[in-house]
A protein has these predicted regions:
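Bacterial N-terminal signal peptides that target proteins for export
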Residues: 1-10
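Bacterial N-terminal signal peptides
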Residues: 10-18
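Sec/Tat signal peptide C-region and signal peptidase I cleavage site
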Residues: 20-24
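PEST-like low-complexity, intrinsically disordered acidic/proline/serine-rich tracts
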Residues: 25-340
Length: 340
């Protein structure tokens, strides 16, 4: 027994599970859509101080301008405490005419030609043709429990936490347990001699700005409906806490993407995160994300996303498996085993 599902439905299920009932109670359905995110204020894109051929040149230039970086202590380092959620960003405008979060993975948008290399532009046109035909990209890597990776991490609309220390910064996303570790004042190290979903990130502080260089990233995409990235993708980010017109905290990330196999020249965008004290008040916490043993979605022969349902031989019970189902206390939900 199989059923055709849209990726939009699958994404909604994941979002509800990730953010919890408290999030759903606080925001309306419309308020959590990409269209509403696209209406949120977003700062102007800040281009690099001059053109750079590589991320390494860009990063080292900023490091020199910062005289080696600010040496923070635990008493001086910026604190980005609390829970955060993704806001608006300008990335779709790199690849689409009048691109925004409202049309990034929906039909009707026109591709900007001459941004991608010929081979990657050809692939992007094929992806957008699928969006035009079916109203969406039929299959997304997340369906197979693959990591969103960089740069998709910057936008993923889930709960995040940021912890800054003098020697490291931890950027934690509840989706897929994706924690970015930025090693402050360090060099890139790759003892495994391979690429990674989140790459390898080093950084330095320039006052209250955190500058980050990420490389060795697995090929992925910018987000569903957007172009692919290659295994030569790198990016340079600057992170800074600001306040919007209402006085609310926000994190602003100015980023430049470098990808010689996919981009004709480096491209820049700005991303934002909103402080969400309401989530903390409602008791939302980041939990361990579990996907591989509970996901019943898969890619069908026609390229669409389908789901196994109870009764299918391949169906996996999201409550898990036990050799002793009759033994009290073996359920993953302790409510069912509570004494009456």
């Amino acid at each position: 027994m199989q059923v055709r599902k849209t990726l939009a439905i699958g994404a909604a299920v994941l979002l509800t599970a990730a953010l919890g009932v408290a999030y759903a109670q606080d925001r309306t359905k419309q308020d959590s859509t990409a269209e509403e995110q696209a209406k949120l204020p977003v700062p102007q894109v800040e281009l690099p101080p001059k053109p750079f051929k590589t991320a390494e040149e860009h990063y080292k230039y900023l490091l020199e301008k910062a005289h080696g970086g600010t040496k923070h202590t635990m008493s001086t380092i910026p604190v980005w405490g609390g829970l955060w959620a993704s806001g608006n960003n300008t990335m779709p405008a790199i690849f689409l005419v009048n691109g925004s979060l409202s049309n990034a993975w929906r039909p009707g948008a026109k591709i900007k030609e001459g941004v991608l290399t010929p081979t990657y532009e050809k692939q992007f046109k094929q992806r957008r043709a699928e969006v035009e035909k079916f109203g969406e990209q039929l299959y997304d890597r997340l369906t197979n429990c693959e990591y969103p990776g960089v740069p998709r991490w910057l936008w993923e609309p889930y709960v995040k936490e940021f912890v800054n220390m003098p020697d490291q910064s931890w950027f934690m996303n509840d989706m897929m347990n994706e924690t970015r570790r930025i090693y402050i004042g360090a060099e890139h190290i790759n003892t495994e001699a391979k690429h990674f979903p989140l790459g390898d990130s080093i950084g330095f502080w320039d006052g209250d700005k955190l500058v980050v260089w990420t490389k060795w990233v697995n090929p992925a995409d910018y987000v569903r409906g957007m172009p692919l990235t290659s295994n030569q993708f790198e990016m340079v980010e600057t992170w800074q806490e600001r306040h919007n017109a209402s006085g609310e905290r926000m994190l602003v990330t100015q980023v430049t993407f470098y990808d010689p196999l996919a981009l004709l020249k480096p491209q820049s965008a700005v991303y934002t995160h909103e402080s969400r004290p309401d989530l903390k008040k409602d008791g939302v916490r980041i939990r361990t994300w579990e996907c591989d043993s509970s996901s019943n979605s898969y890619k069908a022969a026609d390229g669409s996303t389908q789901f196994y349902l109870p009764g299918d031989p391949q169906y996996k019970n999201p409550r898990g498996f036990t050799d002793f189902p009759d033994l009290p206390g073996q359920s993953l939900n302790p409510i069912f085993d509570a004494p009456q």
